């Protein structure tokens, strides 16, 4: 029953949170895990800090994003699926013609119903992800049709990267490290399966 409990936490609470390398969604995720284990510690590292061969990126958060056609119909809304936005997209708020918009739309022709997961952590870029079926619907619009494009995202150079850790002491000084990622949103493998299994293991060994 305990494993089922953590499965339900993942399904009902973690799956819907938008997460990336940094941001509010990560903190919410870690706080949900902490609510289950008081020994769980949430740590933070400042954006810009050098960690081995990596530099902590600016904190990225997004409030909303959508595409609206000439009839004021919302043909894509970030609220419906976290995968609809390229991770770490730059903000944009403008009208674009069809061909220009299509340059920033990603899909999977061989999996026409699936939404791809795309990121652009280190290159300044913005983009949308949708099923290939959705993309084909946009292609049906006239060449001169314009679309209202909005990505309300922000970068904070004074932000943080957050991570969580817990140490369960055993009978010896030897350690076994178990790690999991939380940075990919709305996917079962492994940014949902990882935290669920990790919570189950914490409960089992403590």
Feature-to-residue mapping (PLM):
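N-terminal hydrophobic/helix-forming segments and targeting peptides
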Residues: 1-206
């Amino acid at each position: 029953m305990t494993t089922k409990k953590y499965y339900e936490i993942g399904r009902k609470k973690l799956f819907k949170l938008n997460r990336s390398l940094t941001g509010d969604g990560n903190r919410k995720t870690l706080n949900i895990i902490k609510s289950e284990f008081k020994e769980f510690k949430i740590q933070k590292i400042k954006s810009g800090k050098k960690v081995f061969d990596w530099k902590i990126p600016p904190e990225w958060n997004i409030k909303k994003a959508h595409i609206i056609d000439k009839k004021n119909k919302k043909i894509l809304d970030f609220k419906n699926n976290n995968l609809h936005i390229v991770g770490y997209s730059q903000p944009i708020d403008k009208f674009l013609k069809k061909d220009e918009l299509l340059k920033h739309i990603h899909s999977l022709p061989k999996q026409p119903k699936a939404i791809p997961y795309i990121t652009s952590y280190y290159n300044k870029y913005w983009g949308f992800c949708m099923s290939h079926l959705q993309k084909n619907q946009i292609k049906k619009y006239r060449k001169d049709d314009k679309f209202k494009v909005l990505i309300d995202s922000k970068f904070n150079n004074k932000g943080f990267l957050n991570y969580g850790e817990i140490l369960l002491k055993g009978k010896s000084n030897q350690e076994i490290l178990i790690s999991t990622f939380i940075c990919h949103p709305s996917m079962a493998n492994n940014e949902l399966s990882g935290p669920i299994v990790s919570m189950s293991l914490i409960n089992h060994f403590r």
